[in-house]
Each structure stands twice: as structure tokens, then as C-alpha cells.
Amino acid sequence: MPLITTETGKKMHVLEDGRKLITVIPGDGIGPECVEATLKVLEAAKAPLAYEVREAGASVFRRGIASGVPQETIESIRKTRVVLKGPLETPVGYGEKSANVTLRKLFETYANVRPVREFPNVPTPYAGRGIDLVVVRENVEDLYAGIEHMQTPSVAQTLKLISWKGSEKIVRFAFELARAEGRKKVHCATKSNIMKLAEGTLKRAFEQVAQEYPDIEAVHIIVDNAAHQLVKRPEQFEVIVTTNMNGDILSDLTSGLIGGLGFAPSANIGNEVAIFEAVHGSAPKYAGKNVINPTAVLLSAVMMLRYLEEFATADLIENALLYTLEEGRVLTGDVVGYDRGAKTTEYTEAIIQNLGKTPRKTQVRGYKPFRLPQVDGAIAPIVPRSRRVVGVDVFVETNLLPEALGKALEDLAAGTPFRLKMISNRGTQVYPPTGGLTDLVDHYRCRFLYTGEGEAKDPEILDLVSRVASRFRWMHLEKLQEFDGEPGFTKAQGED
């Protein structure tokens, strides 16, 4: 059989014998051990799967492939559409891109799903609280777009990109997931009180889409309060949908509530491809010692089976895992201490021996087929009735103090249809002076407002920039636009 699309919108490769073909990437560090243990359990459970094993990560970087993902791996994923992946080493600082992020962005796996639940016999201060929640993290936008520039030799900039399309997709995904898992409440965590345009886009999308799901309670929460509430009363949460950076932080926090990253699976799901992996890293210091806990990768495989709509096999494996933990005789070193913890192979064998058994105290949640949400595919889904360029922010590098810079820019703008409105330094207005005490850096935003008829024209803007450039080094321009009469830009701290 060829690549098929299910009634719920998922794409998968089904072989003639009915098995579903997936790509397996063993990964780096402890990854191969975790994946090997998981494949043994899948095979013992007679999961109807076939595998193509491919590589990514450290070995690929060593071959000089800067993305960390070779073409043969990309071709396999395009064929199978489903990936089970071990952790990959991530370069730190300068150098290659993260292969993890490359895979997510290459295949537009826009939804990162990280379930968290209490496990039996896993020590945690929250034992008995009934924690059972899912963090749904937008996976390709935000600061993780990775668009960075050195503005001056000592000032760096990262662009935080949040789109309406990306926000609507992740919000719809969260509500559909809540329905499929029988959950009754979705929280949206943003920092829209500070980043009113970027983070505010997710908040506005959430409030609009929530009206289509009257059976689910929709609650907006500021992200720092979400972190506070997760520590104080985590059982109040069922689904949290949030932006990329916020989700990265909150999901690691939630995994700490239930015993650590060894019990934290995840899925990266898009309209075309789904990638399943543990949240934890490659932990090279434990590699090859047969002591690691493969539970996170195994639970990621359980998530994969449910995505493939192999619910019976998923329940079989999850029940065996929960029975093993509940029994408490064979537990790994991260749970009971490495001096007396079971070997990885012993733990894996215990789970296999418990296939077909049901835990007495811990129940597996009921799952229904999850429907991938559909959104407007237009590149520009929002078309304003009117728009107007009302000015320009010119970013310059200089060691001048604000008053000297302001006077110089006012002289340079004389005779143009622009007036200098204000100058800010790291977001705080420093000219005209407000009486504040600002520690300055060599990066100024200089805001010019248009005083001519209609809107500012490109030749007029370029003439202004040319005048500024005759005296100062500039590195960045931003048009100030109004959409339907509303400003598409924010004010500096202290700006009137």
C-alpha cells in the first residue's frame, strides 16, 4: 500500500502486510541504548511496525554536514512520515545548528506535545497529588526561529517571530488534543502583559478559537504565574498551550514534578510528519554503562502507537510499564539510586515479562483518535482594510550620549518630512530625557515620525537613512505601520 492519509488527517506508510513503516534514529550518547530497549518491547508486544534505521546528530556533524541531518535520513522521513528518535547531541554556542531543531523545522512539526503524569513508586514531593497534564508547545516560531544578528560588537539581537497562522494552529491542536483525551480545561500561558504584539497574538488566537469549543473551559494565564501555580497546585492543570520558549521551560518544570526527564516523553507533530522522542538529552557520561532509564523513549513510542491508531498495542505496553513500576521490584538507578538500581536490560526484560498484566492502582487514560486541525493555508491569512507607514525606527551604533545624539539627528532630519520623536536604549527612552538613570550601551533606537501627506514613501525613508548614515553607523530599520488605524508597533518605556 502507498502512503495513506487517515480520516483524522494523519499521514503514514502502510506496507502490504499491514505493518506501518517508521524511521528509527538511535541518536547519540544514551540514545542507542534507550532505542534498543524500546524496540525490544515493541517487538515483544508484536507492534505492527517495520523500521528504516537512519542517523542524525554527532556522527553526521563529524562528517562535515552542518545541519546534522544527512539527505538519506531526510528521504526516509519523507517516505515514512513517522519517526522514533533517540536524543541527539546539540552544539553549544558558535557552530552547527541543533539537529533536533533542524528536524522539527524541516518538517514543520509545529506542535510539541509533552504529557506529564504521576508514576507509581517514583519518589517526588508531589506523590499522591494526581498530576496528569499535557504541555502543548508551539514548536517552530518564537525565538527558536534562530534569526540572530550582532547589532554592534557588544549587542546581540534575536527576532521573536509569532504569526497568526502558527498561533491558530497550535491553539486548535491543543483543543483537539483535549477532546481526544477527554480533558475538560485548556490553559493558554503567555507573556502578553509585556510583549503585547508577539505573545498577544497567541492570546488573541486562543480567545477566538476557544469559542468553537464550548465543551472545554478556556483560561488565559500569565506564564510566570503558570510556573508559580504548577509548583503550588499542579493538579489544577489539564492542558497548557504556550509559545516555544515558554513551553520549553514549563515542560521541563512539569517533568520535575513527576520524577525527572527519565519519565518525560514527547511528540513533535505536523500536518505531514510526526517525530517521537524523549525530552531528555544524550547524557554521554552514562552511555554504554547499561544503567540508564529508557522509560521516556518507551513512552514516546507509546505516543507514536496512538498516533498510528494502534491503541490496543499502546495500552498493552503502557500497562506493562505501569505494572512494573507499581510492583517496585525492578527499578532503574535514577529512581532508587545507582548503587542498587536495575540495569537497563533488566528493566526492559521486566516490562516484557509483564506484557498482558494490568496495574492495580494506576489507570491508563482512555484515548480516542486525534484529529489534526485544519487552518487557512494562505500565506497571509489576515488582510487589513487599510495600512499606512507612519514613520521609521533607525537603529544606530554610537558612543555619543543621548542628548548629543538627539541634537545631531534633529539637524540631519531638518528639511525632510520626518521629525525625531524619541531615542531609546535597550527599550527605555533616553531622549528627550525623562529623568531616569539608564546604563547605556552603544545601540540606540531612533524613532522618526512622518509629517508629510499620506504615508511615508520608500524614497523618503531611504533619503532619511542616507542622511543618518553620513554621520552614524546604522544596522537596522523598522517601518512603523498602522493597520486599520491601529499602531503595529509598541512604545518605549517612558515614551508618551
Curated annotation (Swiss-Prot):
Assigned keywords, A-Z: Glyoxylate bypass, Magnesium, Manganese, Metal-binding, NADP, Oxidoreductase, Tricarboxylic acid cycle
Keyword match Metal-binding: yes
GO biological process, one term: tricarboxylic acid cycle
Binding-site positions, NADP(+): 88, 90, 193, 229, 232, 277, 281-283, 285-286, 293
Binding site for Mg(2+): 248
Protein family: Belongs to the isocitrate and isopropylmalate dehydrogenases family.
Function (record text): Catalyzes the oxidative decarboxylation of isocitrate to 2-oxoglutarate and carbon dioxide with the concomitant reduction of NADP(+).
Protein name per its UniProtKB record: Isocitrate dehydrogenase [NADP]
Species this chain originates from: Thermus thermophilus (strain ATCC 27634 / DSM 579 / HB8)
Lineage: Bacteria, Thermotogati, Deinococcota, Deinococci, Thermales
